[in-house]
């Protein structure tokens, strides 16, 4: 397998909480190939209480509440924490972007900002065998 086709992995996280996504889902300019392209957040296990509150609130539309990484965060390669905007409130941290896929999210935010839309990526919360997980519906930013 070619090194550029491998999914980025953070071995410090449990195998079922590393998130998912691949550069194969994007064109050369990090534009999603399909409207159905998703990116599953990593490190959601510690956030199960917050995710349960989101589900219990019954909010239909969820969007990310994140900003682009600062030069300091880029330099130290800090994890990109994700919060959700649900209705009228911003939640606590619900996960992080999988290692190596931060440029995909940065590009989606700048693409939304460039066309004059709010810099919020649609999201959904899914139930898995390992608990609640957050999928960013990044294909909808095309």
Segments and roles (model prediction):
Residues 1-142:
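Conserved active-site motif detector
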């Amino acid at each position: 397998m070619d090194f550029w086709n491998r999914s980025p992995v953070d071995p410090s996280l449990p195998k079922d909480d590393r998130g998912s996504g691949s550069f194969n889902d994007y064109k050369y300019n990090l534009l999603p190939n399909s409207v159905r392209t998703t990116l599953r957040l990593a490190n959601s296990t510690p956030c199960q209480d917050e995710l349960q509150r989101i589900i219990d609130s019954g909010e239909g539309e969820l969007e990310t509440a994140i900003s682009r990484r600062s030069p300091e965060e880029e330099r130290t390669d800090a994890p990109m924490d994700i919060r959700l905007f649900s209705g009228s409130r911003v939640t606590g941290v619900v996960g992080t972007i999988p290692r190596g896929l931060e440029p995909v999210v940065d590009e989606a935010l700048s693409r939304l900002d460039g066309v004059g839309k709010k810099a919020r990526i649609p999201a959904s919360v899914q139930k898995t065998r390992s608990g609640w997980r957050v999928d960013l519906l990044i294909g909808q930013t095309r």
